[in-house]
């Protein structure tokens, strides 16, 4: 089982959601199913089928969260030196063709939000960046094609999740 790096805040939120689903929501759904079952014929009982569907979705979420929390490796990126790109690093890249500057922060898969500049450590882009130093040249494959960037800066900034 491969560990997945994760921020403490994310681990706490996922663990709380898992506990809520297991200790509260399961009981609520079971009660709704029992009440719907008492309404009679199960073949044409919309309330029963809706509750069973909801139960299936909830159990799938419980299984997913159990896996993610079980594989989590809580990491505090503020303790790293960030002289090389690593988990939690914010990387400032400069496009060699346009001199346009972009910033990405390497986070766990559960925390990624590419539109906000938070990229998963498992993403192809992060895999290229991990281990690189300031001044290194990297070639990234983007939706718009291949681009070459210079790593202008690697730093740690507190990570704010949405």
Curated annotation (Swiss-Prot):
Keyword ATP-binding found: no
GO biological process: DNA-templated transcription elongation; regulation of DNA-templated transcription elongation
Coiled-coil annotated residue ranges, if any: 1-28
Gene3D superfamilies the UniProt entry points to: Transcription elongation factor, GreA/GreB, C-terminal domain (3.10.50.30), Transcription elongation factor, GreA/GreB, N-terminal domain (1.10.287.180)
InterPro entries assigned: GreA/GreB_C_sf, TF_GreA/GreB_CS, Tscrpt_elong_fac_GreA, Tscrpt_elong_fac_GreA/B, Tscrpt_elong_fac_GreA/B_C, Tscrpt_elong_fac_GreA/B_fam, Tscrpt_elong_fac_GreA/B_N, Tscrpt_elong_fac_GreA/B_N_sf
Keyword set, alphabetical order: Coiled coil, DNA-binding, Transcription, Transcription regulation
Similarity comment text for this entry: Belongs to the GreA/GreB family.
Family annotation (PANTHER family): TRANSCRIPTION ELONGATION FACTOR GREA
Name of the protein in question: Transcription elongation factor GreA
């Amino acid at each position: 089982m491969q560990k997945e790096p994760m921020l403490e805040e994310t681990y706490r939120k996922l663990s709380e959601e898992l506990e809520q689903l297991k200790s509260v929501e399961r009981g609520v759904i079971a009660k709704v199913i029992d009440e719907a079952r008492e309404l009679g014929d199960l073949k044409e009982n919309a309330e029963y089928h809706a509750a069973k569907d909801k139960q299936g979705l909830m159990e799938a979420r419980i299984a997913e969260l159990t896996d993610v929390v079980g594989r989590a490796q809580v990491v505090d990126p503020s303790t790293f030196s960030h002289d090389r790109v690593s988990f939690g690093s914010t990387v400032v890249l400069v496009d060699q063709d346009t001199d346009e500057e972009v910033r990405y922060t390497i986070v766990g898969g559960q925390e990624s939000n590419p539109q906000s500049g938070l990229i998963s450590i498992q993403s192809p882009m992060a895999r290229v960046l991990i281990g690189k130093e300031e001044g290194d040249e990297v070639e990234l494959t983007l939706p718009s094609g291949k681009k070459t960037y210079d790593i202008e800066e690697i730093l740690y900034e507190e990570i704010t999740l949405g």
